[in-house]
């Protein structure tokens, strides 16, 4: 655990760890204090209620003391006669003791002397208040009592009894309370230690998406800068060549101009792709609309013309014979990316097949070619931004490794899946499944 703490101290998620651990510490500390406070406040509730009840009936308290007495004291007979008239029975237990005092707070009856109660001293200022005292018995053991002092107000007889003190032994309650407090502290401390590990885990989990996002952003900027560096270098080289030939005609430098224009087109395509990706990062929200079957026929006709211009054989099959509901713009962009990718990675006179079909809930796109193919290792990375299977070939074809990344985002937005397979004997197959709706279920 200490090694984890040491690593966290120097990690990027240390601030998250401190924040989480601080919250857990505050929670467990507050819970511990509240529980202990509740225990203390409720520990003597029943004892204090009993003492208050006895203080309201001093005659019954005197009767209790007399009944427990083992010897007679001065003026006790008159007090016995008067107290015997009490009909209300006091609510007492075996751990309750009564001490009688005269007006000078001299003990008249102290009960069991073994308990050491004959040595306690009370004062009039404590009258009517419940408080706690510690008494040592004959064996030197400490006993804890809750005490209330009351005035007897016995005036019908001649007696020296002026005050009575009721004591209830709470030593067992104190011992039980201490054990419970220790148990609570141990349990809370254990959970506090567990919260340390929980804070480590939460810090790692909380910061992971941020770190991944920062790494992707850093990689994105580095790759974009790298892609822009090449066309800028070409432009600089061509322009410097033009400056070195001030007497040359346009025909003489037409190759440099054409190359520069090509690089400008590449940069414009790159910046457009980057802008599209940035917009998609904010979240693609499909706008559903009815897409007629003629849309696919028109799109395939355009693809056929492009394939012919690039000396490719393009075959298509439209198995959709009804109107579907999806985002037409995103669907066309997805189809174009897959078609353009097949054209780039297929040699001249190569073959490209595009099949589209649908069920009640899903639309299926299948694009296959007999091009150079994609290795198993590359299949895991082709949807990453700026990843290219053959960088030299892709660069020559004007690609930047952004198309398939954007296609994956579109597929995810349309609640679909895309898989890549090998075509036999060579080439690649892209299979796409996206969710669609029927016109009757179109969302308004």
From Swiss-Prot:
Return the CDD domains for the record: HATPase (cd00075), HisKA (cd00082)
What sections of the protein cross the membrane?
A: 21-41, 183-203
Q: Can you tell which superkingdom this protein's organism belongs to?
A: Bacteria
Q: What's the name of the protein?
A: Sensor protein CiaH
Q: Which organism is it from?
A: Streptococcus pneumoniae serotype 4 (strain ATCC BAA-334 / TIGR4)
Its top-level enzyme class, in one word, is: transferase
The catalysed reaction is: ATP + protein L-histidine = ADP + protein N-phospho-L-histidine
Q: Which InterPro entries match?
A: 2-comp_sensor_kinase, HATPase_C_sf, His_kinase_dom, HisK_dim/P_dom, HisK_dim/P_sf, Sig_transdc_His_kin-like_C
């Amino acid at each position: 655990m200490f090694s984890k703490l040491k690593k966290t101290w120097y990690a990027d998620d240390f601030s998250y760890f401190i924040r989480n651990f601080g919250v857990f510490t505050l929670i467990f500390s507050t819970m511990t204090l509240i529980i202990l406070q509740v225990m203390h406040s409720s520990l003597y509730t029943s004892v204090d209620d009993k003492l208050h009840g006895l203080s309201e009936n001093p005659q019954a308290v005197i009767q209790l003391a007399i009944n427990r007495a083992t010897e007679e004291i001065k003026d006790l007979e008159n007090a016995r006669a008067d107290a015997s008239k009490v009909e209300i029975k006091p609510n007492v237990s075996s751990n309750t003791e009564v001490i009688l005092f005269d007006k000078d707070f001299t003990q008249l009856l102290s009960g069991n002397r073994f308990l050491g109660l004959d040595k306690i001293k009370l004062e009039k200022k404590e009258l009517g208040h419940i408080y706690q005292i510690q008494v040592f018995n004959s064996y030197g053991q400490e006993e804890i009592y809750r005490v209330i002092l009351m005035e007897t107000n016995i005036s019908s007889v001649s007696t020296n009894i002026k005050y009575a003190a009721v004591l209830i032994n709470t030593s067992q309650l104190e011992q039980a309370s201490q054990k419970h407090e220790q148990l609570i502290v141990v349990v809370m401390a254990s959970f506090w230690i567990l919260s340390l590990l929980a804070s480590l885990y939460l810090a790692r989990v909380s910061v992971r998406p941020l770190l991944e996002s920062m790494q992707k952003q850093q990689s994105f900027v580095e790759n974009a800068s790298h892609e822009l560096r090449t066309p800028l270098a070409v432009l600089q080289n061509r322009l410097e060549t033009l400056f070195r030939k001030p007497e040359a005609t346009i025909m003489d430098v037409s190759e440099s101009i054409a190359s520069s224009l090509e690089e400008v087109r590449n940069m414009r395509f790159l910046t457009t792709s980057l802008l599209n990706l940035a917009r998609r990062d904010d979240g693609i929200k499909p706008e559903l609309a009815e897409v007629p079957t003629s849309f696919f026929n028109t799109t395939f006709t355009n693809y056929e013309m492009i394939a012919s211009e690039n000396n490719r054989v393009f075959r298509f099959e439209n198995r959709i014979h009804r109107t579907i509901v999806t985002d037409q713009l995103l669907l066309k962009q997805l189809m174009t990316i897959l078609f353009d990718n097949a054209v780039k990675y297929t040699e001249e006179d190569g073959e490209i097949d595009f099949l589209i079909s649908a069920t009640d809930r899903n639309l299926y796109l299948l694009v296959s070619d007999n091009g150079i193919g994609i290795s198993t290792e590359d299949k895991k990375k082709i949807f990453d931004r700026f990843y290219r299977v053959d960088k030299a070939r892709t660069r020559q074809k004007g690609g930047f490794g952004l198309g398939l990344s954007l296609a994956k985002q579109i597929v995810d937005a349309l609640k679909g899946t895309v898989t890549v397979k090998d075509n036999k004997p060579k080439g690649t197959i892209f299979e796409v499944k996206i969710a669609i709706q029927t016109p009757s279920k179109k969302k308004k």
